[in-house]
Amino acid sequence: MRVRPAAVAGFTLIEVMIAVAIVAILAAVALPAYQDYVRRGNIPEATAALGQGRIAMEQWFQDNRTYEGAACPGNGQHFGLACATTATTFTITATGAGSMAGFSYTIDQNNGRTSSTPWGNGATCWIARKGDAC
């Protein structure tokens, strides 16, 4: 009596290569979208800090009748803040660092907002996502 050999179970090399190729294609599409999503998620850190900084500057002006000497808000995790003040004007700039390099947002005493991002520049607004315009 002949014994039949047991069937070999498992994947062939071709099947594994096709699965790897499919995963690579999906990763190539998903990674840039994810990176864009993460960048957009970091932008509110800058805009919130600028808004809070503007309020602090206005409170200082109400107490002292000058913007000079007002404290600049502290740096965040992804943005560094810098202030320029005169007796009657101020500008607060949030400049991106690390993964947010290339992003810059400003606000002034008139609530004038500008932005410079890899996605485009906003002369009168803050650009928060790719394709936005003022």
What do these predicted regions represent?
Residues 8, 40-44, 48, 85, ...:
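Residues at secondary-structure transition points
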Residues 38-66:
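Membrane-proximal N-terminal amphipathic helix
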Residues 55-134:
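Periplasmic/extracellular, small/polar-rich flexible segments of pilin-like filament-forming proteins
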